[in-house]
A protein has these predicted regions:
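N-terminal Rossmann-like FAD-binding beta1-loop-alpha1 element of flavoenzymes
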Residues: 6-32
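Conserved FAD-binding catalytic core of PHBH/FMO-like flavoproteins
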Residues: 60, 143, 147, 151-156, ...
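N-terminal glycine-rich dinucleotide-binding loop that anchors FAD/FMN and/or NAD(P) in oxidoreductases
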Residues: 48-70
Length: 402
């Protein structure tokens, strides 16, 4: 097993594994440092419902990942956005934009299994698992040295480029001296699978409430994926609800658009915070995925943004012999600036506005939704971002061979 690679990725979650696949298919020698042992899924691959934008579906199909899914996905053909207690609403139809779907709903665990199946078939990929990042070692010319700990003890890896894809509290990002800007939304997100008297019909509902958003996502197994935000101080109470009380709470939040809610699967809870890296690159290093930006789930843009980051990086690496040069990384950061800043601003602004219960903001919220419904240009801006086609989009996301 060699300890020298073109690229070492620390973190085998959604973005890290996707980048490893993209680079390996380009012939790049990749080392992947993973916390989970062989045969065990990383914790991120749970029962969460992932909303893949159309651009993301294009890219993952080109990478051979979507074909590995063993369970059906749920197509999103229309989007319905409203706010509890306000009169405005937005309704979007994919066919109005020349598309069959806005994207697909995929269960995180199913996606993890598909990634694993794809990783298994790659040459040029060395997997270190279970292993953890310990720190950086003295560098050699043209390489970055990093220390990892695995079952055999500590070892030093050498890479022309190190990628930090190790999550919101990234140890690699911290070791690089990259600071973060943080905001705690004071909310907790509950995720579950529910069954209703009406099966999914391709509509994704986003219901905005005083304490946070509630989304209903059309899964491919005739269930709905529910994402329910509550104020942090209510989280323990909501977690303690029995299924009858839990379903009643959801029914009040979403109304009767999908009929009566009749059953719920296990609930998981996640605190919601915004953690944004102050810069994306360092000396022969890049931060990606949640290590680069952990954003509010409203609009379901987190993984979609992270994948566009990863594929843009893969494109830049393909353009030169040395993936870690300062000019290559500067070009990457410049290409990602517009999409990243717009997505961060949209997600954060919408989260803060819609979660603020002040009656003074009610006319603004309602007028905003009414204006969105009436103005095709505003809808087109929303749709372009939601589908992942706004700004400098990687070729695989556009459905082009690369």
């Amino acid at each position: 097993m060699t300890d020298r690679h073109d690229v070492v990725i620390v973190g085998g979650g959604l973005v890290g594994a996707s980048l490893a696949i993209a680079l390996a298919r380009q012939g790049v020698e990749v080392g992947l440092v993973e916390a989970a042992p062989a045969g065990q899924m990383p914790a991120v691959f749970d029962q969460r419902n992932l909303s893949f934008a159309a651009a993301t579906v294009n890219a993952l199909t080109a990478l051979g990942v979507m074909q590995q899914l063993r369970t059906p996905t749920g197509p999103i053909r229309r989007i319905h956005i409203s706010r509890q207690g306000d009169f405005g609403r937005v309704r979007l139809e994919a066919q109005d934009y020349g598309r069959a779907t806005f994207g697909q709903v995929v269960v995180a665990r199913d996606f993890g299994e598909a990634l694993e199946a794809r990783l298994d078939g790659l040459s040029g990929l060395t997997r270190y698992r279970p292993a953890r990042f310990v720190g950086f070692a003295p560098d050699e010319a043209g390489h970055r040295a990093l220390r990892i700990a695995d079952a055999e003890g500590e070892r030093t890896l050498h890479a022309r480029l190190v990628v930090a894809a190790d999550g919101t509290r990234s140890a690699v990002r911290e070791a690089l001296g990259i600071g973060v800007d943080e905001h705690d939304y004071g909310q907790t997100l509950f995720v579950a699978r529910v069954r209703a008297t009406q099966a999914p019909d391709g509509t994704a509902y986003e219901r905005l409430g005083d304490d946070g958003p509630t989304a209903l996502l059309p899964r491919g197994d005739r269930h709905w994926g529910v994402v329910h935000g509550v104020a942090r101080e209510q989280a323990e109470t909501v977690a303690a609800l029995n299924d009858v009380a839990w379903l009643a709470r959801l029914q009040r939040a979403v109304g009767w658009r999908i009929g009566r809610l009749v059953a719920s699967g296990e609930r998981s809870a996640y605190p919601i915070a915004r953690v944004v890296a102050q810069r994306l690159v360092a000396d022969r290093a890049v931060v990606l995925g949640n290590a680069a930006q952990t954003i509010h789930p409203i609009g379901a843009q987190g993984f979609n943004l992270g994948l566009r980051d990863a594929l843009t990086l893969a494109e830049e690496i393909a353009r030169g012999h040395d993936p870690g040069t300062a000019s290559r990384l500067a070009a990457y950061a410049a290409r990602r600036r517009e999409d990243r800043e717009r997505t961060l601003a949209f997600s954060d602004g919408l989260a803060r506005l819609t979660a603020n219960p002040s009656p003074l903001l009610k006319p603004v919220r309602s007028a905003g939704l009414v204006a969105m419904e009436a103005q095709p240009s505003l809808q087109a801006f929303l749709v372009g971002g939601a589908m992942g086609f706004r700004g400098d989009v990687p070729a695989l996301c556009r459905g082009e061979a690369a």
